């Protein structure tokens, strides 16, 4: 009876050892590398962690606007000022343009206007015409409640000026900060306002071409055709304008 127990115990130990070897072998490859799912997930997580993250850089320094110049001036034009990262103007002044050109990007910033204020943010502008707005699409900045341009949604806040309308009741009242995001990726463009996508269109498409031909831009044959250009801020309207937290993320 004691011998039977001993053999049974030995068989149990051997069975357990063999099972352990089989389990260990299933987890280990020829080079001792794990072949189970969990380590593969860890590798994927590590790869994701090593992947390049979106890099945003500021276009407005805290106390200077060294990345900007006037449309007609090599320096910051009279009437514009920079204070603690906010660039502002009061009255009619020269337009601002970046010193650097941009092709594909996401741009985000906050802006506010005084009562009845009117301005715009231009993208992919060139210098072939007398003004940037004859070459560059424009994200309209407007006090919809009081500015005459709001009579048409084609020229209201966040519209692609003169071509694609933006809906009403998204922009905040004057003297309040609005949040804007603009995506320009190849031919694809998106206008966002206060967390809502309000305009989306394709540059150079048949629809876009037809709209340009029906607009005042038809007199400027290269309007909107540039694939790379300057970002501009319109200054030639009266009233106050302020922008802050302007950052850009360049796309491939």
Description of each model-found segment:
Residues 1-7:
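Positively charged n-region of N-terminal signal peptides that target proteins for export
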Residues 8-19:
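Bacterial N-terminal signal peptides
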Residues 21-252:
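Carbohydrate-interacting regions of secretory-pathway proteins
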């Amino acid at each position: 009876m004691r011998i039977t127990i001993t053999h049974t115990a030995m068989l149990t130990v051997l069975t357990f050892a063999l099972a352990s070897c089989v389990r260990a072998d299933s987890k280990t490859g020829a080079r001792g590398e794990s072949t189970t799912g969990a380590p593969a997930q860890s590798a994927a997580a590590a790869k994701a962690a090593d992947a390049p993250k979106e890099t945003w850089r500021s276009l407005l320094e805290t106390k200077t606007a060294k990345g900007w110049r006037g449309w007609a001036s090599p320096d910051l034009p009279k009437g514009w000022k920079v204070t603690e990262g906010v660039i502002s103007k009061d009255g009619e002044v020269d337009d601002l343009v970046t010193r650097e050109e941009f092709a594909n990007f996401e741009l985000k910033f906050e802006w506010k206007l005084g009562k009845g204020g009117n301005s715009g943010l231009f993208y992919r502008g060139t210098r072939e015409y007398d003004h940037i707005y004859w070459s560059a699409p424009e994200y309209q900045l407007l006090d919809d409640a009081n500015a005459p341009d709001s009579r048409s949604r084609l020229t209201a806040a966040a519209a692609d000026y003169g071509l694609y309308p933006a809906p009403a009741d998204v922009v905040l009242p004057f003297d309040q900060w609005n949040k804007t995001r603009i995506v320009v990726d190849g031919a694809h463009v998106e206008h966002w306002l206060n967390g809502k996508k309000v305009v989306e269109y394709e540059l150079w498409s048949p629809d876009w071409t037809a709209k340009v031909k029906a607009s005042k831009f038809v007199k400027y044959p290269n309007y909107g055709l540039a694939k790379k250009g300057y970002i501009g801020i319109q200054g030639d309207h009266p009233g106050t304008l302020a922008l802050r937290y302007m950052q850009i993320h360049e796309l491939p």
